[in-house]
Design a protein with these regions (language model features):
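FIC/Doc superfamily catalytic core
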Residues: 1-243, 247-312
Length: 312
């Protein structure tokens, strides 16, 4: 049965973690109007019905993708070029990327810190937020440390940069230091993701599976977006750590794009539901088209973020 406008709006609010005011802003209308639609006191005109439908699919996730649209999205994404040197030598660009990547990736994993909170913590080493947990504040600083470590490695080694087991373990150590007891080590126990149908790797097989993944990460790639989707999917299915797999995986995806001179993808916290949906489809059915589209669109998100920030 087709969901009502009210049901779709409620799902958008829940999954995007928006207020009614934020939802109204994304629909270019007033909060009062959105409230009337949600409570079925008013019916949106066709123009807004179409906007709601597109926003709903964007947040909740599509079920398929037209091949021509996929091709166009991928072509647009790979045309957005940037190098790690471009980022490191421009403090404004580095700060914007660090702030937004840290905020969105940690929020996806449950952090309640706002963008302003993260900015405060990253800008002032001595800052302590009394209304946020110590863990959340450590997570923000640790994420920056892990990101800077990878960026420096890529910048220093340039075309000699390769992915290694030690690099991945060091990234996890920096990311999860003071948060988990086994930071910087592969898990030595079984694991499952609550609510997911994906069967994760047996911990005994993790070292061998990581070696296989490293060979793929270090091999040439013709279709970069497909390459990013498949390697990201593979890492998350291996799920090599007791915690922090999503954040490490998105860091690897981010830096892998930079390694190939492409604008890195920013996975928005509002699109967490769609992201997980596409990832699960790829992992279970080996159908990567939706995840490819999502990654391509996430690259454009980063491009637009930098374009808007540098023009301010």
């Amino acid at each position: 049965m087709e969901k009502t406008i009210s049901q779709k709006l409620k799902e958008i609010l829940l999954n995007a973690d928006w207020t009614q005011e934020e939802l109204a802003r994304n629909l270019n209308t007033s909060q009062k109007t959105v409230n009337l639609w949600i409570n079925e006191k008013s019916t949106p005109h066709l123009k807004y019905t179409q906007k709601i439908e597109l926003l709903y699919l964007d947040i909740i996730g599509y079920v398929d993708i037209n091949s021509e649209i996929l091709s166009k999205r991928k072509s647009d994404a790979v045309s957005k070029k940037i190098s790690v040197a471009d980022i490191i030598k421009n403090n404004d660009v580095l700060d914007v990327l660090t702030l937004h990547l840290t905020y969105h990736t940690n929020t996806i994993e449950g952090s309640t810190m706002t963008l302003a909170d993260v900015k405060e913590i990253l800008c002032d080493e001595n800052k302590v937020l009394s209304n946020k947990t110590a863990k959340e504040q450590i997570e923000a600083k640790n994420h920056r440390s892990a990101l800077y470590f990878l960026l420096d490695e890529l910048n220093d080694k340039a075309d000699k940069f390769i992915w290694t087991k030690e690099l991945i373990l060091e990234t996890h150590l920096r990311l999860m230091n003071s948060i988990v007891y086994d930071a910087g080590a592969f898990r030595n126990h079984g694991a499952r993701i609550s609510g997911s149908r994906v069967a994760l790797a047996n911990y005994i097989k993790i070292p061998a599976l990581i070696e296989d993944l490293l060979r793929r990460l270090n091999a040439p790639a013709d279709d970069l977006i497909c390459f990013f989707a498949q390697t990201h999917c593979e890492f998350e299915k291996i799920h090599p750590f007791s915690d922090g797999n999503g954040r490490v995986g998105r860091l690897l995806l981010f830096v892998s794009a930079l390694q190939h001179g492409i604008m890195p993808p920013l996975v928005l916290k509002e699109k967490k539901h769609a992201y997980y949906k596409y990832l699960e489809i790829a992992q279970i059915n080996e159908k990567f088209e939706l995840l490819e589209t999502f990654i391509a669109e996430s690259i454009i998100v980063t491009y637009n973020l930098l374009k808007n920030k540098t023009s301010e």
